[in-house]
From Swiss-Prot:
Family, as annotated: Belongs to the GST superfamily. Mu family.
Subunit comment: Homodimer.
Top-level taxon of the source organism: Eukaryota
Protein name, entry field: Glutathione S-transferase class-mu 28 kDa isozyme
Protein purpose: Conjugation of reduced glutathione to a wide number of exogenous and endogenous hydrophobic electrophiles. GST isoenzymes appear to play a central role in the parasite detoxification system. Other functions are also suspected including a role in increasing the solubility of haematin in the parasite gut.
Native organism taxonomy: Eukaryota, Metazoa, Spiralia, Lophotrochozoa, Platyhelminthes
Transmembrane segments: none
UniProt keyword list: Transferase
Domain annotation GST C-terminal: ranges: 88-211
Keyword set includes Transmembrane: no
Molecular function in Gene Ontology: glutathione transferase activity
Length: 211
């Protein structure tokens, strides 16, 4: 992919594109971050394969274009290309396991989107008192089982990036929800940022968005 121009296309938010962005950042890969307004989306939609975002457009040195769609498929592709899916079959399994656990948590978050405010607050209360703590406990057990300081060993993997993206969404629902609880999750983030100065800078510089 050396010399290719990579464009990540999504709305002005973290959402389903953030794991892709963070994978490229952690790998030290330059990319163009194109953010589309909801107002402009109807006219841009026909130009995107499948008419869904996020999408990645890769243009090689000869001008040949390759499109990639489906957020986790893209993130996995980029992570594998840059050796961020574990170094052994056992590590690969643990990476995928944690991605699955994080996605279970993400599904709870997505229940709150595009809802009227009163209904949204009701759903937030239900999930924060229901499945979210259970899923966070499961994730903490996986982090405890790691053989290193990060999600799977001591090298940054896609599991680390998917996890912190989802944890940020939990914090979006209630900024105090994680305070004083789930020490493994707090320690994981601390270790991850210490392990990847590029990622730490990206997160420090990242503008606040509603999703």
């Amino acid at each position: 992919m050396t010399g290719d121009h990579i464009k990540v296309i999504y709305f002005n938010g973290r959402g389903r594109a953030e794991s892709i962005r963070m994978t490229l950042v952690a790998a030290g890969v330059n990319y163009e971050d194109e953010r589309i307004s909801f107002q402009d989306w109807p006219k841009i939609k026909p130009t995107i394969p499948g008419g869904r975002l996020p999408a990645v457009k890769i243009t090689d040195n000869h001008g040949h274009v390759k499109w990639m769609v489906e957020s986790l498929a893209i993130a996995r592709y980029m992570a594998k290309k840059h050796h961020m899916m574990g170094g052994t079959e056992e590590e690969y399994y643990n990476v995928e396991k944690l991605i699955g656990q994080a996605e279970d948590l993400e599904h709870e978050y997505y229940k709150t989107l595009m809802k009227p405010e009163e209904e949204k607050q009701k759903i937030i209360k239900e999930i924060l008192n229901g499945k979210v703590p259970v899923l966070l406990d499961i994730i903490c057990e996986s982090l405890k089982a790691s053989t290193g300081k990060l999600a799977v060993g001591d090298k940054v993997t896609l599991a680390d990036l998917v996890l912190i993206a989802v944890i940020d969404h939990v914090t979006d629902l209630d900024k105090e929800f994680l305070t004083g609880k789930y020490p493994e999750i707090h320690k994981h983030r601390e270790n991850l940022l210490a392990s990847s100065p590029r990622l730490a800078k990206y997160l420090s510089d990242r503008a606040a968005t509603p999703f």
